Amino acid sequence: VTGNNPTKKPKKNPTRRTKMKKLLSTAALLLASASMASAEGQLQLFNWGDYTNPALLEKFEAETGIKVTLTDYDSNDTALAKVEAGGGGYDLVVPSANYVPIWVEKGLVQELDLSRLPNHANIAPEWRDVPWDPGRAHTVPWQWGSTGVAVNSDAYSGDINTSAIFMDPPPELVGKVNVTPEMNDVMSLALMYVGGEACTEDTEMLKKVRDALLAAKPKWQSMDYGMTTKMATNDVMASVYWNGAIFRARLQNDKVKFGYPKEGYPLWMDSVALLSDA
């Protein structure tokens, strides 16, 4: 989700989820910063599942001799609840943009010492000063992208650029649709599908989307996270998911397609933060 304007009502398709070298190198520098606090030569990274490039960790371990232990989560709420409860002993976390202010307000993440992050100045200008973290005082960019719908074209050959894929599945997909457990994205897609705006406080609109989701849920197969593999292996024929993850599924199975709902869809950015007790 990008700052105070978390949605896109597109006229044309954007690019797939982007893994920008500058962002990854900056994230690696934050790993290095956190490692300075690791007296035992270990670093605990708490990140979304199936999201961390193993090559990045291998490179970091080879260059520093510090072992990275990766623990994953499946939603922003899961990550926040676990850290807030005091569990895990993690050093780094990767919250989405709209959750960063919550982490900061709760005192769960540190203000960054920019003198130890020389490449901080190399962050692309559009990401350097953002509404959810002014001046990038607490985070550095990790990745950004969009949330949409993935469909296996062997199961369904109709229009996939619509949230009807999960809000009102066609007969071919009834009982074959997965929905990600990241409820911010699901609510954003659903609100725009019924004619509302993401982050609305309109009670009647929220009731409308609640009723629409409850009506749709019996037609779903699951609410699960690991769709990169499951879409690639035909275990699931359609899913609400993220464009980068589905692109990886498509590398294994070219029948997997990604749709950008014409009703609107969320854009997001995930950023790396150093936990207060790291």
Please annotate each region the language model reported.
Residues 50-52, 76-78, 98-102, 146-147, ...:
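Solvent-exposed loop/turn segments at secondary-structure junctions
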Residues 122, 206-214, 250-276:
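Periplasmic-binding protein-like
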Residues 89, 94-235:
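Extracytoplasmic ligand-binding site segments that recognize negatively charged/polar headgroups
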Residues 40-102:
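Early extracytoplasmic/lumenal segment of secretory-pathway proteins
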Residues 20-39:
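Gram-negative bacterial Sec-dependent N-terminal signal peptides
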